[in-house]
Amino acid sequence: MRMFPLLPLIAVGLFGSGCSSSDTRPLPRPPSVDVPRFMGDWYVIAHIPSRPEREAFDAVESYALRPDGRIQTTFTYRKGSFDAPQKSMHPVGRVEKEGNGAIWGMQFMWPIQAEYVIAWLDESYHQTIVARSKRDYVWYMARTPQVSDSDYQQAVERIAAMGYDLSLIHI
């Protein structure tokens, strides 16, 4: 039995479902993102996870610019606990023409592409918030595995101002 016709339906179930908000305001975003500077490792500090990430611990998102201009992503995590073996996912990102580098499409499997908006990025490229217009998933990430309490609180306030339900955030 061929499974390929079912893959798009499975992808919608995995990535398209979630608790979305009725907030329809456009997400904020920086005036521009220097995509090559954005590349590298980002530690997930807090997030409202997608279905595959719900049991992710010790998560790191790594980006590398490919020769074709797309972004090779490696999401490493430990499923279920900090002691679990490391697992990874390998979606490919594409920077959209509009958005000055802040709007990407992230493809986990063809032809499904998820919205990926860099909604906030500090000037030093050390902290970021990646969001979706549906307000169903959000990621607060930093270049280091820990941030100060003040930075964390400011990020949570930014996420709330975007219209997210803070009770869904995982730390």
What do the predicted segments below correspond to?
Residues 1-7:
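Bacterial N-terminal signal peptides that target proteins for export
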Residues 13, 18-169:
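A beta-rich soluble binding module of mature secreted/lumenal proteins
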